[in-house]
Amino acid sequence: MAGSPLDALRDLPLADRAVALSWLGQAGFALRTGGTGGTGGAGGTTALIDPFLSPWDGRLYESALPAARAEGVDLVLVTHEHIDHFDAASAPAIAAASPEAVFVVPAPIVGMVAESGIAPDRVVGVQPGDDIELAGLRIRPVPAMHGVTMADAYGFGRELSGGLVRFLGFVLDAGGVRVYHAGDTIHFDGMEATLRDLEVDVGLLPINGRDPEREARGIVGNLSEREAAWLAREVAFDLLIPMHYDLFARNRGYPSHVVDSVDRDHPGVPVFVPPREHPFELGARR
C-alpha cells in the first residue's frame, strides 16, 4: 500500500524549529513540528486540524488519508461541528489508530465529540482567551464568526451555547512559526487587531466566500478571496495559504483570485497555494 500523507509528512527532513504542513483538502491540515517528543516516530509533535476523511456524497475527491492509518497523531484540533471540520464518522478510527491523541474542540461541542466514540478524558474543550500547551504545541483559540445554520449565522454561536463561543480558529506556536488556522469565518470587528496582537506569521484562510444563492441553500459562507487578501495585508502575515475552496462543486473558491487581488490591491502579501497531500516546510520566523 502506498504511503499516506502522514507518512510523507514524517519522512520530510525538518529542522528543529521548523514546521511541516500538508494540506488534506478543504480545511484539513496535518502539521508536524521539528525537534523531539511526540508519538509519531519522527520527533516533534504531529497534529491534525479539521480532518474530513470520510466518504461523503458530493465530494469532488476522496481523502488520501484513511482514518485507520492516522497513526502517531498527538493532537486533533476541531474548529466547529460541521461535517467537513468535525467528521464524527472518522474520529473514532483516528482515536483508535493514535491512542495517545487528544482532541481539542470548542467547549460547547465536547459532548458531541465524546458521543461520537471518543473517550471523554481525551477531549479538551477550549474557548477564546485560553492559552494551553499540549504535546509540546502551544494553542490559543480565537473566535470565528460563522453559524450552525443560516438561522443563526453570522455570529459566534453564543445564543446556542449558553454564552460560550461555538466557532473557533486556532493560533499555534509550532516550532519557530506561529500559524493561524481560521476555521470557517467571515470578518468581524476586532479580528485583525486580535491576530496582530498574537503576532501571527502564517494564515490559513478560507476563501470560498458567500452569496445569496448559496445562503438560500443553507450554506453558511466564509471570507471571499478578496477579503482573505485584505486580511493578510492588514495583519501583515508573512505568508497567506488559501484553504476551503475545492471539495464541493457548488461551494468553491479560486486561489487564483486571491493572487489577482494581492497583485492588484495588496502588493507584497506572499501567497502560497500548496498541492494537496504534499508536505512543505516553513522555516523558523521567531
Locate each region found by the language model.
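Metallo-beta-lactamase
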Residues: 2-16, 106-177, 261-285
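Pre-active-site segment of Zn-dependent metallo-hydrolases
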Residues: 5-9, 14, 30-96, 148-157, ...
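Active-site-proximal beta-strand elements of phosphoester/diester hydrolases
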Residues: 20-23, 46-50, 138-144, 178-184, ...
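Divalent metal-coordination and catalytic microenvironments
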Residues: 31, 50, 80, 87, ...
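Structural motif
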Residues: 45-47, 74-75, 102, 137, ...
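Active-site environment of divalent metal-dependent phosphoester hydrolases
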Residues: 55-56, 82-86, 110-113, 130-133, ...
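Metal-dependent catalytic neighborhoods of phosphoester/phosphodiester hydrolases
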Residues: 87-97, 112-118, 250-260
